[in-house]
Amino acid sequence: MQRKKLISKTPTTAVMLALYIGVAQPSITSAQEYTDQITGANDAYAAHGIRTTVGMESTYTFAEGDVVKWTNAYPAVEVWDEGTHLKFTTPLNLQLDVKDGATSGIHAATSNYDTPGRLTAQNVNITGQSTGSNYDINRIYISGIDTYAADIKIENLNIDITADGKPKSIADGIFMGRDFDDEDSEHTLTVTGAANIKAVSKNGYYAWAAGIEAQDQAKMNFGKLTIATEAMAENLARTNGIFAAGNSEINAGETHINVKGISPNPDESSYSYGLNAIHSSTITLGDNSTIHAESSGDGAVMTVGVRTGYHSEVNLGITNIRAENNSAEGTVDVLFVEDGSVLNMAGGSITGANNANNRTFNAINAYGEDPDPTWHTDTIVNINQGTTNDVVIVGDVRAANIAIVNLNLNTDASSITGNLDQSGPYVDKDDSAGTINLTLANKATWHAMGEYGIGYSYLEKLTLNDGSITMTNEEVQNIDINHLQGTGGELTLEADVNLNTGFFRVNNADTDAAAVHTSYAGINADNVKDAAGLEGLVRNSLKIHDDSAAKFDVQVNEGLLIGQMQADTINHIDGNAIANVKIAQSTTVDAISHMQNATALSWRQEDATLSKRLGDLRQGDGDQGFWVRLNRGEFKYDNAKNQNNFFQMGYDKAGGDWHYGAAISRNSGKTTYGTATAKNRSLALTLYGTWLGDKGHYADIVLKEGRLSNDYDISAPIGFTHGQYKTWGSSISAEYGREIAMGDKAYFTPQAQLSWLRIAGKDYTTANGIAISQDSQSSTIGRLGFELGSRLGDNGNVYAKASVLHDFGGSADTRLSYNGVSTTYSNDLGDTWYEAGIGFNLKAKDNSYLYADVSKAFGGDYKTPWQWNVGMRWTF
């Protein structure tokens, strides 16, 4: 045995024993580096590092840190022929560095398939490279494990190898196959614990890299598995994460695969497969797995996340799969299932990446085999069947030549983005269509989009149980469904401003009474305009079989001027009709109407009674008076609320039984209504004459003219509107009453008042271009009421008051137009309400008087939750 010291800062005490046929070898007391044959097991084969042959059972125990560094073109470790068993009880570290040839870390083979050789090891680490060129064997080759008809058991495995050379550069992390002269042979490789495999092939005219390659009835079992491969070729590059052929079987738990193929030659190709099962093989992966496949180059690049073909089967737990390429000439199939194969996937994601405007981009591509009944089996893709796992699919789904795709999306986090086509890209006169069955349930969504290549959807059966479909894309999309089942869900179709849209068609009279709520994206009610426009839109977009029990209602979101449209539909395969049409007032128009009402109501609220304006005029001693008052309050009308501050001051002079006066006033208020706000202001001049007759009679006549302004902002789903305008307000009021004494102090004053108010019309345009023309609005208000009070000698009085008021109304039309769309609304403030309050008049000094009251209006559409008024009058 020859050995060389491994350079180490801290030598370790260890023992290496080679036990073969019961004979022990000498102890080694420090970590060793082995560069030649390790003798003892089978010294006749010096080209191998360690080799066993027929009938031998050998056990190797290496010291910690021992490494076998191998530069020979033969395997570093070989199990050869029948009945052999090679055991490693401590970590096995192999470092390969071979020039101009082919090599393997571990090679196992036999000439008798009934009793294959065996290898048992733990913590196996294989690293290295094969470089240079060899045109005699036409390749540079390296494999971590290369086995034919052997039984291998390893606990924890790490492989990191590179093939770098010409003409062909080939790297297999694990290759397992057999000789072809025994059709019944089986062989198994089992790795417990974790297996980490990296294989890189580069610089050859042809490059092949595979993490695992299984041929000819090979069987492999793994726990947690991680694979990374990369093939970089001057011409043709091929890479596989796992490749299984010839009735092979591979099982793994949680698995993570990352593969990449690169070929810069525009006349050559690059092929990348995450999983590739063909020729009656089976691959099974556990939950929480990931597969990422990527290709790049200037030629015809193909990327496949998972392929299963020729009567093979792939079973995936919850797995996230992504396939992408970076070539303008490239194609992507995240899942590619063909020729009588089956793919079952419990859940996860199936996504493709369109990095360079790929010609085709398929999340699922299923193509069946010849339907000849003598040997045909179905090609089937099953996603989330019988489970409730999240599923996310990005890319088109195709089924051709009687292939079957079953998609079950039944969680609110599940979605598919792409088109579904069961005619398939290969269908011609010699082919048949496939079958796609889709279930959308529990808020799962389908975004039908044509940007990945197809441009329409055609499927056999849609089961809709509280799922949603969105047909939104710049390109018009069509969906054809043979059978619609389930309880129903949501459908959104995109249309352009000319009401061009794709269609949703159900071709058969299914008995399920699916209730489908249909809405339209890309347009609003302003585009549709009226019921006739809605009828045309529905006929073009919904084509439901006449005898279908499904029920479709439609909705168009509101525009600026036209409100939300709703209707039921009547099924007809050539285009549904509509019934029970409802067109609401838009948020914007409704808010403009309420802002206009706020102006009118604020003007009406300024109309005051005599006592509110002047207090008790009879208490004054002089023939002239100056007065001021402040009023603050809040009113509500039809869910609009206004808070305002009103200030007024005036002067009057007595002439016989009359007091003639004038006043100026300023009102400032803020109105809120939903998402709309407004500032209401007025500046007014008032002229009045008040008659104080004998026996408590009085009359009060008031004329007022004011400048009114309204500045409003409206936030609506369709957008923001700002408007402002100014107009004139006029009013005339006449009040009559009589104070009737009820003893020394008490009194009762019945009152009647009639007012006429007018707000002039106005034309203006909002900031976003809505042209508005308001008619003038007039209103007549009658009031009947009383005061019941008590005098405080010569110092004033206190009182309670109550009234009933009625606005006789008077409608005013407002016309609005925007981008060729117009609408009209009418405002009529007719109403009956009640007012009640308390107040006082108090002589402050010989020639000054304080008066105040609080009141509340209730019982009608118009309400004032609170209002107070306070004033001061000086006489001289």
Give, region by region, the residue ranges found by the protein language model.
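Extracellular beta-strand/beta-solenoid scaffold signature
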Residues: T39-T53, K69-D81, Q95-G117, T127-A149, ...
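Solvent-exposed, glycine/polar-rich loop segments of beta-barrel outer-membrane systems
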Residues: A591-H594, Q643, K670, G674-A676, ...
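Extracellular beta-strand/loop-rich repeat segments of large surface/secreted proteins
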Residues: N365-N382, T388-L542
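Outer-envelope beta-barrel architecture signal
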Residues: S414, G622-F626, N645, G656-Y660, ...
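Outer membrane beta-barrel transmembrane domains
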Residues: T686-W691, S773-F876
